[in-house]
């Protein structure tokens, strides 16, 4: 079922609350002060039922200029607008301001309602309609229906209900794919139930039992119960007004303007990159560095507006800007906002968030402007490539992209395949992507790094993988680093072993003397069997003039894995260890455990040397010590290959 929020807007005392009551039977003025003063101070909500069984939620917002903050808190989730104009007064200051706010918040459809028509004659109504048409020209309400109503006589109420029903049928359906998010506009507690928050669910769906988080502080909680218009429900979907009973958190820990969201789906930010607009009828110039009041959802923040491509934003103009906030805010790309002048407090503009987690920008940076232009109006493919590119060597997974883009996974997979075929993206591992430009940059760095390494260590088989990961990718996740190196290997640029990487065209070249030393070292270590040989003993086999060459060849043999360090300085020939591996494997085919004594007897060595060998296997993860015995370790499968 489609869920639609209808927002009432208009000047104070123009009959919004009475109109809601006539449509729904609900008096949305709930506060004693509202009853006493006869004006709406805070938000009111009502359910509007239609004959076909469908329904919509109506948000009644205050019309008095002193309560614009409350009006903004309720307007954030509005799909359709009812602009209310009293027939006996016409357009008034808050009518204009409310219309500006709805326009800034991206509301795209609605209608205009003339109230109190019983107080004026037909000629006046005709003139008023013409005036209203001229006032809404150029806005989303241009050419929209204008309906005449009177709560006192009942005129036009049913026609209005039918018109609203028709609008809801054509309203755009919200996506339930993105993680749920509910900006909180009320928080209170009820005896026996605990903490309750209310708001409009603007993304995703939330269910009883869900784990949730309150931003910007990050406090954890759980959804105990849900209500929509006073009725218990098991789940709430985007576009519905809801009351959420929370467990695990006190009312005092929550403020109006906080956001209830899926755990770890949002991160607060102190900066926002935006497209900022100064209203055409604004009386203010927004200069770079100006302080403004930012209204986002139900939250209010002080913000410093840094204009990125000019010094001042005049009425009717728009530009890219960075808003630097006084307090952290939880937002998402594509969210709308409103800004009001710092003092005096008046609505001057608003816009759309392009990046909720930007770096701090310098002004007049052409690359930043170009990047923001893609975020604002680029194609879906361009936005996807930019999103992946901004993650650099981390890249993005399909799951990452699904969280960022409100698209079905099937469409994302199709777009990714096209972009890979065009050479814009590279799938470095299943469902993990980097931009081609990022991969090219990484290869340039990798080639430079390995060329230098081969020049300095010509007898090494290559750079150790752990060192290559650290130097090339500066501590990125091992899985990602390995995927990038493996990608280079698939392209024929690298050779990879379990321990090393080298340029594909690199090979170790030994002199005749180095080759002779190599053979002697291998023969000696092979003859020593599992006892091995100390490095200084191996170097002592040669004349002093060959000591330096011996050290180089030893280093080469260790890098290629032909010799292995059983313990510091103690070298064992690889085929000897392979034979011991075979014994260990055979032992555990018939035994569950291995003791030091059993291994000593199998090797025919001393107890101390047997312990060295066991500790070597422990370090590799081949074996795992449990008290006085060993069992197969996490890497035992290595010796089965």
Each model region followed by its residue ranges:
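Residue-level recognition of beta-strand microenvironments
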Residues: 11, 187, 204, 226, ...
